[in-house]
């Protein structure tokens, strides 16, 4: 009873916070999560090998994906490469230790293949999240597989303190390895996207003759400053990954999630006369510390989206959420790309002045996340609002009955399904419409649509019989209204819920990897179109 009263009180507070929320949620919005495997943060809870461990790991993943489906999440970013390892059978990397307890040990199954399959069963996109460069967070002795020892012997690695170690971004073989790893994932698995996080060069790497990469810089820089030289190598890696994806499966969405502040007047912002720099007090530390220049990736059109980690609240003194969100919305639109914000679950309450620090999200500040979603929607200039939540375990309560951020988001922001924003800068094949759509015993069926390796999904709508086809259309001209959107399916059939099996007509649309939705085909519609 006390938990129910507490949850009710939280909802009242959030309602007061969010009086400005739109009456209807947008049809187009990315809703995603970071599904973290490094240190087994989100998954798996069970570490080991053998039939019992495998069954437990699979069940944990299925339970998690059920939670995400219940929250109307549109994609899951599954971490498949955290420290130059793999959560799948790789030709280039050893198996991760975070699955079995020992690096290089085959678990006897393929978590990425399973995650893709289970996501798609639930109508959720599966994106492969990779850390491109990181090798170790605790020294050279951490990993001792033959693969890792070979990398040490052959000079692949770079560090400034002997503890945090990365692949050397300036080495051609390192760049090629990253491209090859991405290629094997994009070619070998039906992933819908690829996402890099915010780790590039080792933090605080020297920029003088004491630097570990100074000899290479001196021999190959052609007069560039060492900072520009390092950033250029990161930029080249990003471009080569993007080019590979375009040549392989161009409907796979590719983006990066850098630190939140970039494009300031004193760093990269000065390059663009028509793009006002990011105007917050917080520094653009990543530009000269880890040599990350996110605005350059937008300018060079080597990513489809940017997802800066705006892990600060709307009231933060030096890095407030609103102005940073507004800047990235402008920057992404300026260069013809998408901006989806990355949020930190629990960050708001941890930084409230005078508030005691606590583990996990505080129900008293759940409204902060609703305000951030509203900012995304308000500032988008190209109908491409979106959110990626870190870490996804913070979205739902640890115990039955607990209040959770996900409950609040579901009530005020995500109470209808959404489609991801449309990729408008690529030429997509015309997949047309489904054929032979029919309804029998509560199951909608239609012929499968295929076009090479193109991602093909379907949207299913259930519209009350009293609503005409014309009245069911969205006011902004984007097909049928999202309030009638019943499901997204990767299969060419769908079991209707019992409450939707009578009193409705139905529509099925082809929905591709670029998020284009094609002409609806109706079933049991009696009126005029």
PLM region spans:
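Active-site-adjacent "subsite" loops/lids of carbohydrate-active enzymes
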Residues: 28, 34-59, 128, 133-184, ...
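Catalytic domains of carbohydrate-active enzymes, especially glycoside hydrolases
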Residues: 56-85, 188-192, 302-306
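Aromatic-lined carbohydrate-binding/catalytic grooves of carbohydrate-active enzymes
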Residues: 71-107, 210, 305
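Polysaccharide-binding and catalytic clefts of secreted carbohydrate-active enzymes
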Residues: 74, 81, 146, 152-302, ...
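Substrate-binding cleft of secreted/luminal carbohydrate-active enzymes
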Residues: 291-317, 331-426
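Conserved aromatic anchor
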Residues: 441-453
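Recognizes extended acidic, P/S/T-rich segments that occur
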Residues: 457-501
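Beta-strand-rich modules
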Residues: 464, 496-519
């Amino acid at each position: 009873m006390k938990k129910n009263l507490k949850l009710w009180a939280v909802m009242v507070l959030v309602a007061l916070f969010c009086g400005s929320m739109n009456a209807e949620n947008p049809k187009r919005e990315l809703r995603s999560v970071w599904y973290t495997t490094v240190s087994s943060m989100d998954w798996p809870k069970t570490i080991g090998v053998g039939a019992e461990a495998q069954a437990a790991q699979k069940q944990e993943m299925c339970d998690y994906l059920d939670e995400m489906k219940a929250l109307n999440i549109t994609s899951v970013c599954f971490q498949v490469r955290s420290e130059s390892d793999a959560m799948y059978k790789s030709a280039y990397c050893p198996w991760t230790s975070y699955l079995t307890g020992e690096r290089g040990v085959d678990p006897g199954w393929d978590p990425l293949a399973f995650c893709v399959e289970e996501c798609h069963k639930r109508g959720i996109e599966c994106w492969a999240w990779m850390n491109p460069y990181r090798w170790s967070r605790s020294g050279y002795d951490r990993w001792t597989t033959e693969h890792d020892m070979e990398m040490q012997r052959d000079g692949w690695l770079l560090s400034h303190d002997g503890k945090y170690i990365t692949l050397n971004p300036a080495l051609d073989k390192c760049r090629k390895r990253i491209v090859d790893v991405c290629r094997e994932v994009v070619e070998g698995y039906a992933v819908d996207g690829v996402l890099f996080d915010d780790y590039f060069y080792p933090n605080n790497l020297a920029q003088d003759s004491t630097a570990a990469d100074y000899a290479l810089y001196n021999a190959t820089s052609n007069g560039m400053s060492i900072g520009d030289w390092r950033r250029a190598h990161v930029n080249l890696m990003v471009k080569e990954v993007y080019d590979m994806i375009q040549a392989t499966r161009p409907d796979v969405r590719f983006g990066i999630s850098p630190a939140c502040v970039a494009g300031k007047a004193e760093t990269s912002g000065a390059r663009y006369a028509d793009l006002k720099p990011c105007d917050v007090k917080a520094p653009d530390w990543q530009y000269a510390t880890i040599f990350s220049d996110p605005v350059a990736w937008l300018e060079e059109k080597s990513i489809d989206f940017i997802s800066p980690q705006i892990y600060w609240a709307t009231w933060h003194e030096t890095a407030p959420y609103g102005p940073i969100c507004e800047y990235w919305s402008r920057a992404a639109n300026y260069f013809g790309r998408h901006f989806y914000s990355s949020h930190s679950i629990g960050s708001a309450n941890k930084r409230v002045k005078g508030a005691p620090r606590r583990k996990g999200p505080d129900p008293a500040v759940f409204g902060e996340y609703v305000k951030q979603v509203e900012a995304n929607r308000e500032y988008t200039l190209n109908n491409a609002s979106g959110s990626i939540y870190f870490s996804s375990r913070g979205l739902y309560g640890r115990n039955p009955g607990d209040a959770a951020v996900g409950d609040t988001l579901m009530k005020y922001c995500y109470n209808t399904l959404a489609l991801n924003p449309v990729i408008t800068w690529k030429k997509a094949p015309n997949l047309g419409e489904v054929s032979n759509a029919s309804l029998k015993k509560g199951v909608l069926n239609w012929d499968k649509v295929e076009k090479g390796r193109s991602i093909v999904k379907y949207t299913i709508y259930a519209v009350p019989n009293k609503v005409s086809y014309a009245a069911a259309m969205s006011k902004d001209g984007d097909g049928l209204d999202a309030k009638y959107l019943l499901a997204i399916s990767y299969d060419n059939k769908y079991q209707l819920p019992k409450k939707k099996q009578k009193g409705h007509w139905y529509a099925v649309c082809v929905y591709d990897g670029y998020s284009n939705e094609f002409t609806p085909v109706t079933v049991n519609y009696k009126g005029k179109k």
